[in-house]
């Protein structure tokens, strides 16, 4: 019996609230968080009435005349043009708020109805249990990057399919071409708070939703895929997985062929499955098949993007990789596959013969070398990994300095709780611990030994390796020590993971083989035994 399964796990940006907050109080090292909480609020007539009165206070003809005069005169930097800019920006800010309100009313309700099928979660760690269960049995991965910049005409064409009002489309075109920075979705680019608005968040959500919904519908119609969600009960320290709506398909006939891939590939009686995972603009597709089939999928995605969005999609944005040789970099982790040995005892009359089953396991490790590079860039250590004092924080109070270091380490430790190379994680703890002590010693012009005696090492920099704060009452402490843990209440990306994902360390994107990954992993000294 042939089965066709399609697992879809998605993290839409606005609804999962995955925008980052900085870990530091004095200096923000991460992007600012976009306040998109009003997307789910009810319609308010008072707010719309205030917007209408604000727009009526401005003279539209006078504002447009000033705007045209500015561009015809060349836009010199004088006081008169500055007053023009203030008047124009104030008017267009009100227009953007009106557009956001109208687009939310028209598009938000059908988007929320369809988003349940895409199965989004707030927890970032909820994606890794799904990848452990399904990605370890796939032969190839495809790492895809969605372009950050969206041409204004693409969004206008998308909205014209839903909104038939021509003046409203012209107003959209006028605003999008005037403020093109709204559609640049790279949060690392320095933009003002007015440009990073609710409208940009909504445009990003709708833009990605159009891509995903169209792609999924084509997959279903072409391959008769039956998608089922990968659910998780978000208990704080446990993940209980459920599978819904599994349907068995009859045997394939001999005649059907894949036409959309531009090749004659007969469908054999096999278990075909496609696993799709996305976080922000990074998405991965895992499938089982030959290299020829993987390259056909690459051509299919590129042509689909160019046909549907009418823009050039660079082939380098789709990088297929073989799971048995190469590793993946996703959300600050290095993901690879290694063989796992399971000891099985077959119960018989006289004795218990022991045999072993070799399976595949998806392993996640923390990139220690690249993480130390990021810490050196932020002046926590030098390039060799030796801790140094954070001189910029010496002006803070004595209690604030340890709290800032503890906050950094706590977020790093809980985010990378699923890694297997714990020695590298404790190396980062060593750097932050001594950097905190050297910062206090530099402030008081003393030595580290005096700081340890005055504050105490445990009180100054407590350890989080015992899982006391997040230990589950259903699991023993031995289990929490020896098994990797995915915390389903982690809803923000760590600073190190975000910097690696954004490509601030170019060496992190290079190919990393499974052989190098296995060398960094601890040996499998304890096997799982199963009695049959």
Curated annotation (Swiss-Prot):
This is Maturase K. Keywords: Chloroplast, mRNA processing, Plastid, RNA-binding, tRNA processing. GO terms for biological process: mRNA processing; RNA splicing; tRNA processing. Usually encoded in the trnK tRNA gene intron. Probably assists in splicing its own and other chloroplast group II introns. Transmembrane segments: none annotated. Belongs to the intron maturase 2 family. MatK subfamily. One of its GO terms (molecular function) is RNA binding. It is found in: Plastid, Chloroplast. Coiled coil: none annotated. GO terms for cellular component: chloroplast.
């Amino acid at each position: 019996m042939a089965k066709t399964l399609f697992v879809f796990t998605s993290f839409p940006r606005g609804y999962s609230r995955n925008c980052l907050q900085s870990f530091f109080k004095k200096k923000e090292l991460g992007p600012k968080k976009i306040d998109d909480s009003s997307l789910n609020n009810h319609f308010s007539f008072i707010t719309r009435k205030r917007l209408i009165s604000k727009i009526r206070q401005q003279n539209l003809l006078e504002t447009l005349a000033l705007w045209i005069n500015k561009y015809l005169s060349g836009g010199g930097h004088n006081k008169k043009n500055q007053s023009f800019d203030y008047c124009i920006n104030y008017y267009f800010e009100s227009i953007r708020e009106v557009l956001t309100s109208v687009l939310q009313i028209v598009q938000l309700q059908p988007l929320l109805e369809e988003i349940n099928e895409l199965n989004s979660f707030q927890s970032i760690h909820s994606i890794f249990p799904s990848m452990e269960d399904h990605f370890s049995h796939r032969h190839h991965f495809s790492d895809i990057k969605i372009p950050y910049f969206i041409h204004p005409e693409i969004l206008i064409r998308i909205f014209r399919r839903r909104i038939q009002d021509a003046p409203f489309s012209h107003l959209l075109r006028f605003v999008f071409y005037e403020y093109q920075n709204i559609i640049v979705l790279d949060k690392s680019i320095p933009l003002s708070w007015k440009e990073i608005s609710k409208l940009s968040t909504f445009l990003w959500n709708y833009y990605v939703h159009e891509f995903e919904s169209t792609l999924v519908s084509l997959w279903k119609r072409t391959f008769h895929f039956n998608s089922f969600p990968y659910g998780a009960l978000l208990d704080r320290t446990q993940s209980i997985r459920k599978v819904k709506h599994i349907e068995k398909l009859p045997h394939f006939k001999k005649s059907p062929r894949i036409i959309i891939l531009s090749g004659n590939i007969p469908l054999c009686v096999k278990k075909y499955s496609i696993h799709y995972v996305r976080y922000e603009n990074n998405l991965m597709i895992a499938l089982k098949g030959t290299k020829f089939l993987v390259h056909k999928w690459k051509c299919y995605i590129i042509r689909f993007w160019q046909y549907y969005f009418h823009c050039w999609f660079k082939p380098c944005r789709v990088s297929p990789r073989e799971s048995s040789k190469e590793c993946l970099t996703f959300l600050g982790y290095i993901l690879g596959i290694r063989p796992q040995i399971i000891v099985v005892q077959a119960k018989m009359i006289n004795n218990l013969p022991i045999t072993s089953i070799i399976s595949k396991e998806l392993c996640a490790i923390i990139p220690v070398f690249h993480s130390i590079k990021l810490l050196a860039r932020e002046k926590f250590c030098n390039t060799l990994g030796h801790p140094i004092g954070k001189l910029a924080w010496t002006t803070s109070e004595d209690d604030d300095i340890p709290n800032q270091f503890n906050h950094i380490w706590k977020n790093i430790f809980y985010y990378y709780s699923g890694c297997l190379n714990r020695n590298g994680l404790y190396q980062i703890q060593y750097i932050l611990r001594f950097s905190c002590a050297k910062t206090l010693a530099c402030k008081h012009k003393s030595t580290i030994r005096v700081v340890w005696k005055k504050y105490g090492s445990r009180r100054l920099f407590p350890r989080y390796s015992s899982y006391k704060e997040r230990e589950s009452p259903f699991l023993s402490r031995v289990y929490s020590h020896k098994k990797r843990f995915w915390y389903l209440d982690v809803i923000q990306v760590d600073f190190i993971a975000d910097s690696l994902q954004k490509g601030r360390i170019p060496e992190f994107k290079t190919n990393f083989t499974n052989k190098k990954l296995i060398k960094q992993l601890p040996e499998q000294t304890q096997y799982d035994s199963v009695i049959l």
